[in-house]
Amino acid sequence: MVEKFVEYAVRSLATEPNQVRVSRSTVDGKDTITVQVSSRDRGRVVGRQGRTIRAISTIVNIIAAGGGSVSVTVAD
């Protein structure tokens, strides 16, 4: 469910929504959602000083409150 929200939010921001890829991994009990976007959309998804991706991450952590902390990152 959390991945679907991230995908929806990022696709809504992207100028090339068909290039958006979202994956989830767990390492040492920590969940990480990684977002891949086109280079043109990277700045738009990250936002000024990381505000946009941080806001998405905050919402994700509220949604996943019972399941622990989830990190959201944008792949290079």
Language-model-detected regions and their locations in the chain:
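RNA-contacting regions in translation and RNA-metabolism proteins
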Residues: 1-44, 52-76
